[in-house]
């Protein structure tokens, strides 16, 4: 049963009438450009064919009812007429409440809604299940009540909800690619202007995501420390963000910086340059150059930004040994576990899957999860 059929059926059972709309918003994988988003830099993600799906209908009162199919059909209910506060027990509900509250704060006028939510974006894997949920909820209200919001505004609203209501300092990339993704393309995003450029993906190349299944948490983790270190670096250069610092400026005074901060800054500056170059390599179908840039990105995350773990490095090495210079592989996401992403010619996928199955668990004691994805369309009706 598809997520659409599942949520429509649950909706009718739970609420006693049929849903009027079904909305989807995809998860994402970032091909290159890690931790650059909150430094006003560049990222190159693509939306993937794993998504959050919401069957919904408008109500004629001011009540919001939300059922989470993936959490034993837990039900959250709140009113649009009283201040929206955090749910004491259901963390999933806070993503919904946060999005609704921030849409209100943006002076959008809308009525009540019934929703049933289900998704297949793996959670805790760094594939943006939370951003996909935020964008899906924002798109539901935009569609049901014809709100004057474009994809970028729905994305910004989701980011605000996660930063201020849920309490995680995420950048804008995850929500933006979920809202604006384009089938068969990656999206080069300028995280300062929010300008996007669709970059066509080479034919015959699979986007493979392998979850290390080494558990990670983002809220309250090292993520926020890295962000502070980057802000310290920007202050040292008296710039609003590291986006405004050149490699030459950095090299001239790197020795004056705290050594740890210097490493963090170097990662961001070199990663930005790699990301812009990667977009052209991808567009030209130059998988060899793309692979080199992904390898440099991984080394920089491992040695300068220090966000990889041995399990992730092992996975990258196993894949690299199979694909050589025919594709690319690196850690993706916030770090400290999660997933690696690989761009691999389709004919090499079985060999990669076999090598990983034979070696990863033997070396780490953890069984991986293997996903072959297609670059997919952003949020909308399904």
Curated annotation (Swiss-Prot):
Entry annotation: catalytic residues: 174
Gene it is expressed from: galK
GO biological process: galactose metabolic process
Pathway this chain belongs to: Carbohydrate metabolism; galactose metabolism
Name recorded for this polypeptide: Galactokinase
GO molecular function: ATP binding; galactokinase activity; magnesium ion binding
Record-annotated site: Transition state stabilizer: 28
Binding site for substrate: 34-37, 223
Domain of life: Bacteria
Any Pfam family hit: GHMP_kinases_N
Binding residues for Mg(2+): 130, 162
List of residues binding ATP: 124-130
Provenance organism: Escherichia coli O81 (strain ED1a)
């Amino acid at each position: 049963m598809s997520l659409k059929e599942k949520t429509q059926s649950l909706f009718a059972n739970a609420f006693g009438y049929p849903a009027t709309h079904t909305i989807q918003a995809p998860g994402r994988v970032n091909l290159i450009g890690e931790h650059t988003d909150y430094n006003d830099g560049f990222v190159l993600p693509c939306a993937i064919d794993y998504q959050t799906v919401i069957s919904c209908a408008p109500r004629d009162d001011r009540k919001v009812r939300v059922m989470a199919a993936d959490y034993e059909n837990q039900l959250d209910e709140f009113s649009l007429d009283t201040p929206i506060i955090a749910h004491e027990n259901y963390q999933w509900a806070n993503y919904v409440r946060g999005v609704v509250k921030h849409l209100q704060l943006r002076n959008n006028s809308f009525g009540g809604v019934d929703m049933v939510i289900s998704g297949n974006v793996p959670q805790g894997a760094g594939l943006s299940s939370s951003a996909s949920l935020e964008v899906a909820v924002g798109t539901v209200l935009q569609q049901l009540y014809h709100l004057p919001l474009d994809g970028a505004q729905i994305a910004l609203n989701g980011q605000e909800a996660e930063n201020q209501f849920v309490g995680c300092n995420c950048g804008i990339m995850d929500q933006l690619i979920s809202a604006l993704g384009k089938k068969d393309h990656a999206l080069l995003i300028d995280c300062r202007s929010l300008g996007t450029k669709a970059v066509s993906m080479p034919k015959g190349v699979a986007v493979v995501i392998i979850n290390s299944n080494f558990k990670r948490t983002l809220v309250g983790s090292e993520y926020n420390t890295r962000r502070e270190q980057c802000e310290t670096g920007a202050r040292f250069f008296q710039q609003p963000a590291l986006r405004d610092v050149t490699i030459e400026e950095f090299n001239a005074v790197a020795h004056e910086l705290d050594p740890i901060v210097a490493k963090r800054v170097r990662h961001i500056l070199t990663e930005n340059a790699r990301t812009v170059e990667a977009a052209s390599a991808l567009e030209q179908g130059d998988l060899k150059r793309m692979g080199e840039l992904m390898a440099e990105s991984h080394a920089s995350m491992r040695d300068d930004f220090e966000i990889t773990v041995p399990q992730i490095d092992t996975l990258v090495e196993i894949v690299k040994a199979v694909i050589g210079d025919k594709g690319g592989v690196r850690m993706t996401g916030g770090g400290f576990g999660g997933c690696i992403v690989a761009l691999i010619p389709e004919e090499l996928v079985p060999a990669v899957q076999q090598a990983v199955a034979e070696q990863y668990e033997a070396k780490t004691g953890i069984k991986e999860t293997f996903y072959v994805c297609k670059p997919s369309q952003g949020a909308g009706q399904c």
